[in-house]
């Protein structure tokens, strides 16, 4: 039974077009991938990697989730998919306490949001914007940079991510 599951996972990885990627992984990472690949969609590399990253994230294996997100980003063929993987990577990096990397992805997430906002995908964008929330979490909680946090809130207001009322509330909470 154990070997059949392993073989099924490997076949799924192959069907998703990830054989070469999988071959160069460390033995430890191969075990992790097979574990999280169980039940993953096999129709695309991106979908399988997202499934693996979400599984790792759900197990609080944040460093591995972030690593898988970086691989998945290479298979994201639309701006919406890049945005989706970026949001997951932000949380994985944040929870791994990799603040600077997370903040860099937050900046990219903001840019992607602005780009997507005017597209046909805009209604699909979630209300919970990880790039926005984690930007403030990092600037205030880790860097203690209240000035930059206020500037970020102003920018979020300018691009329509937060309302004027929300801007006042959030700025007041920084005091």
Roles of regions detected by a PLM:
Residues 40, 69, 75-79, 106-120, ...:
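Alpha-helical junction/boundary sensor with strong preference for TPR arrays
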Residues 41-54, 78-97, 104-111, 125-139:
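Amphipathic alpha-helical repeat scaffolds of TPR domains
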Residues 18-30, 57-70, 98-115, 143-146:
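Helix-turn-helix repeat elements of alpha-solenoid scaffolds
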Residues 116-120, 126, 138-142:
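Acidic, low-complexity, intrinsically disordered interaction modules
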Residues 82-87, 118-123, 133, 151, ...:
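Alpha-solenoid helical repeat scaffolds
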Residues 1-42, 64:
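Long, contiguous interaction/recruitment modules in multidomain scaffold/adaptor proteins
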């Amino acid at each position: 039974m154990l070997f059949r599951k392993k073989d099924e996972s490997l076949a799924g990885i192959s069907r998703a077009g990830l054989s070469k990627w999988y071959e160069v992984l460390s033995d430890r990472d191969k075990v992790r991938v097979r574990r999280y690949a169980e039940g993953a969609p096999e129709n695309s590399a991106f979908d399988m990697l997202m499934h693996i990253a979400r599984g790792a994230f759900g197990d609080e294996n944040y460093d591995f989730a972030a690593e898988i997100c970086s691989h998945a980003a290479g298979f994201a063929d639309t701006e919406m998919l890049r945005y989706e993987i970026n949001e997951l990577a932000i949380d994985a990096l944040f929870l791994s306490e990799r603040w600077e990397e997370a903040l860099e992805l937050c900046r990219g997430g903001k840019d992607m949001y602005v780009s997507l906002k005017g597209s046909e995908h805009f209604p699909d964008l979630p209300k919970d914007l990880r790039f926005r929330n984690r930007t403030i979490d990092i600037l205030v909680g880790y860097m203690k940079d209240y000035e930059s946090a206020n500037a970020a809130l102003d920018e979020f207001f300018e691009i329509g991510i937060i309302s004027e009322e929300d801007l006042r509330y959030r700025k007041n909470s920084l005091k």
